[in-house]
Amino acid sequence: MNSQQCVIIGIAGASASGKSLIAKTIYEELCRDLGTDQIGVIAEDAYYRDQSHLSMEERVKTNYDHPKAMDHELLAQHLRSLKEGDSVEIPVYSYTEHTRMSDTRTMTPKKVIILEGILLLTDPHLRDLMDASVFMDTPLDICFLRRLTRDVAERGRTMESVISQYQKTVRPMFLQFIEPSKQYADIIVPRGGKNRIATDILKARIQHLLAK
């Protein structure tokens, strides 16, 4: 598989802005056209840096909304390998242990790779690897309420810890890093992951790139 046959789409935006939902929708709908083995989804969260050498007390203090928390170098390396036709081992990250697990997830080369993550557009090397980029422009108060519900229900967090993290790092880092990265997006999507028109536009763009 050569680089022209691998279309990489990056979907960025605030935590709980609808990135995973629109990525899932596009994945499922393109799978019907291309087959499940031709499309892959990679979450930026899998590339949080390994913290196994730190105590749990130290891990919970990490600023997970700062670009330095991400191993973007490894992600870029994996994307280049996939474009060159090689399989990669994607890290598995634990939200409860706040570090990588020993397991990995094998991804084989795909025709379409959908990236989703809060800080994707802050890295120029990742932007250079993308064929199209998206920013989910969902109001921050809505994102916070979604995040609060999700993290308590799915990630073993307390309500107090989620609120504290939002005040200390999530909102400040959004304003400092994530929101400014919107300028690099090819498509800006309002109203969250259920925006049908935006989904159709993005699918059409992917299909156009595949037809080249």
From Swiss-Prot:
Gene Ontology MF: a single term: cytidine kinase activity
Subcellular location: Cytoplasm
Pfam families for this protein: PRK
Reactions mediated catalytically: uridine + ATP = UMP + ADP + H(+); cytidine + ATP = CMP + ADP + H(+)
Biological process annotations from GO: CTP salvage; UMP salvage
InterPro entries: P-loop_NTPase, PRK/URK, Uridine_kinase, Uridine_kinase-like
Residue numbers binding ATP: G13, A14, S15, A16, S17, G18, K19, S20
EC number: 2.7.1.48
Protein keywords: ATP-binding, Cytoplasm, Kinase, Nucleotide-binding, Transferase
PANTHER family according to UniProt: URIDINE KINASE
Name of the protein in its database record: Uridine kinase
Biological source species: Shewanella amazonensis (strain ATCC BAA-1098 / SB2B)
